[in-house]
């Protein structure tokens, strides 16, 4: 990889998994449904993409706390990049 590893990782994963913003929005919908079903509550809004991304940063941090693997840090930085952009858009 010749450029920024985070941007290259995002581009590479986008080719495999598709549009990350759409994916993160869909994950938010799925997680909202799971939370509502499990707790028997109704949320006013689905989890926004930026919150999904921040939760994924926490997931990667927990993995990194267990054992070093560079991928955890690269992915966490990518999720933070998405979260910053999406939260700015959300206002």
Predicted regions and their residues:
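Intrinsically disordered, low-complexity regulatory regions
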Residues: 1-91
């Amino acid at each position: 990889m010749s450029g920024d590893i985070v941007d290259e990782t995002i581009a590479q994963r986008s080719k495999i998994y598709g549009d990350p913003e759409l994916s993160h929005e869909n994950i938010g919908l799925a997680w909202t449904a799971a939370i509502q079903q499990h707790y028997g509550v109704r949320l006013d809004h689905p989890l926004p993409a930026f919150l999904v991304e921040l939760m994924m940063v926490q997931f990667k941090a927990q993995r990194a706390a267990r054992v070093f693997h560079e991928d955890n840090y690269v992915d966490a930085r990518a999720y933070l990049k998405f979260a910053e952009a999406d939260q700015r858009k959300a206002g």
